[in-house]
Amino acid sequence: MDVRGPEAPGGRALRDAAENLFQELQEHFQALTATLNLRMEEMGNRIEDLQKNVKDLMVQAGIENSIKEQMLKT
């Protein structure tokens, strides 16, 4: 026996609509999360590439050793 009593008119339709909305929101949230994770990974890779390029430029300019020496002095 169902202790909740009789269902209100339109209650099932409202519940179904709410469940559908929740499912849709969950799918959008998962897609957004995946997109953000991908973009963060891409940004991390770009930062690593930038750091490598800056280091290479410093070596080419001959200033890498002088910066290391200054850091050791302080």
Swiss-Prot record:
Keywords: Coiled coil. Disulfide bonds: none annotated. It comes from the Eukaryota. One of its GO terms (cellular component) is cytosol. The keyword Coiled coil applies. It holds the Pfam family HSBP1. One of its GO terms (molecular function) is transcription corepressor activity. GO terms for biological process: cellular heat acclimation. Residues 12-65 form a coiled coil. Belongs to the HSBP1 family. This is Heat shock factor-binding protein 1-like protein 1. It comes from Homo sapiens (Human). The gene is HSBP1L1.
